[in-house]
């Protein structure tokens, strides 16, 4: 790890084991082959953050980029080339008044390679990053985990109102698009969603 002012950097090696054997339920179009597998992955990430607080910030920017290379023997995966993933997250707070803020965000993940293992497929759902899977992206309107194609991008806009001290109401709208081919992403499938939430800080 490296920390310098508002910048954080990390790089290293991960060892993970997934004891997948079967699914309790799969849809007719969700045909995934799973088995217990171990992985060695190399990773690097950089994070620039100027948000004034961790929860319900009033101002600032968060920009994070990460890259991971996945293998099962430090060099290859399943006897061939390893696969990798690139992720990007951006969020900023635009105060409209002392109580009302606009929070635009943009994030996505791209898988590179044609031999991706199930535990690292792109997934969205829920309100926070990494809710059930480390690579899971939030998406208002989907409360479960949804597996998507190899390239996914989400644009989100939140309107947050502070009421009566530390009470907050947030209106969220988001749009996502996904495709197996990043270079034809705009020809992919679209997702729309939204939510209205309350929170106390």
Feature locations, PLM:
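Secondary-structure boundary/capping motif
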Residues: 98-100, 167, 198-200
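Transmembrane beta-strand segments of outer-membrane beta-barrel domains in Gram-negative
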Residues: 1-97, 174-181, 188-190
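C-terminal beta-signal and terminal closure region of outer-membrane beta-barrel proteins
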Residues: 186-201
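C-terminal outer-membrane beta-barrel translocator/porin domains of Gram-negative envelope proteins
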Residues: 43-47, 51-164
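Short, loop-centered acidic/histidine patches that primarily coordinate divalent metals
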Residues: 162, 172-176, 197-201
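Short, contiguous acidic/charged loop-to-helix segments that flank catalytic cores in large enzymes
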Residues: 143-148, 182-188
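Extended hydrophobic-aromatic, low-complexity segments
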Residues: 150, 165-171, 180-184
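Short alpha-helical linear motifs
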Residues: 35, 85, 128-129, 195-197
């Amino acid at each position: 790890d490296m920390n310098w002012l508002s910048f954080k950097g990390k790089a290293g090696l991960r060892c993970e084991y997934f004891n997948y054997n079967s699914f309790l339920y799969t849809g007719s179009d969700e045909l995934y082959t799973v088995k217990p597998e171990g992985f060695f992955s190399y990773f690097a990430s950089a994070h620039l953050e100027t948000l004034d607080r961790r929860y319900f910030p009033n101002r600032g920017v968060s920009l994070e980029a990460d890259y991971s290379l996945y293998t099962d023997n430090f060099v290859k995966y399943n006897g061939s080339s390893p696969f990798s993933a690139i992720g990007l997250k951006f969020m900023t707070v635009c105060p409209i008044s002392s109580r009302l803020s606009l929070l635009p965000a943009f994030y996505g993940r791209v898988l590179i390679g044609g031999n991706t293992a199930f535990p690292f497929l792109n997934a969205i759902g829920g309100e926070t990053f990494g809710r059930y899977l480390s690579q899971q992206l939030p998406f208002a309107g989907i409360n479960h985990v949804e597996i998507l194609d190899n390239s996914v991008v989400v644009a989100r806009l939140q309107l947050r109102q502070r009421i009566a001290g530390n009470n907050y109401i947030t209106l969220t709208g988001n749009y996502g698009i996904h495709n197996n081919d990043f270079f034809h992403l705009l020809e992919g499938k679209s997702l729309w969603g939204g939510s209205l939430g309350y929170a106390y800080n």
